[in-house]
């Protein structure tokens, strides 16, 4: 179900959920710069494949909220995605540095 999910988005989604388990879908969408519908789809898929689980909590007496918690499987996947994310960013950095150096050399 997540085969089409961008690896950077998948990583950022798991990282944000780990850092802010009580974040709302709306806030998650804003923080990651994607639509609310996309977040809803991704969260359902992450639950289906066992990367996260959903738990209820009462944030106040009149309101029911949810916690998104990474499972052991989700933590393993996040670790793998973190390595891939860092490798991609290092390559982007090296390419950008070469481009900057080339422009500076042409001045």
Model-based region annotation:
Residues 76-107:
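Amphipathic alpha-helical dimerization/coiled-coil segments
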Residues 45-49:
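Alpha-helical DNA-recognition elements
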Residues 2-9, 24, 55-79:
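Short, cationic-aromatic polyanion-contact patches
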Residues 8-21:
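Short amphipathic alpha-helical interface segments
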Residues 30:
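Alpha-helical residues within the helix-turn-helix
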Residues 26, 37:
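Key DNA-contact positions within bacterial/archaeal DNA-binding proteins
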């Amino acid at each position: 179900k997540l085969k089409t999910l961008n690896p950077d988005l998948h990583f950022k989604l798991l990282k944000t959920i780990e850092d802010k388990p009580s974040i709302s879908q709306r806030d998650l969408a804003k923080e990651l710069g994607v639509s609310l519908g996309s977040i809803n789809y991704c969260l359902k898929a992450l639950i289906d494949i066992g990367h996260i689980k959903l738990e209820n909590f009462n944030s106040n007496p009149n309101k029911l909220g949810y916690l998104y918690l990474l499972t052991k499987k989700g933590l393993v996947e996040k670790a793998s995605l973190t390595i891939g994310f860092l490798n991609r960013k290092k390559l982007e950095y090296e390419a950008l540095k070469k481009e900057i150096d080339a422009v500076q050399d042409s001045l």
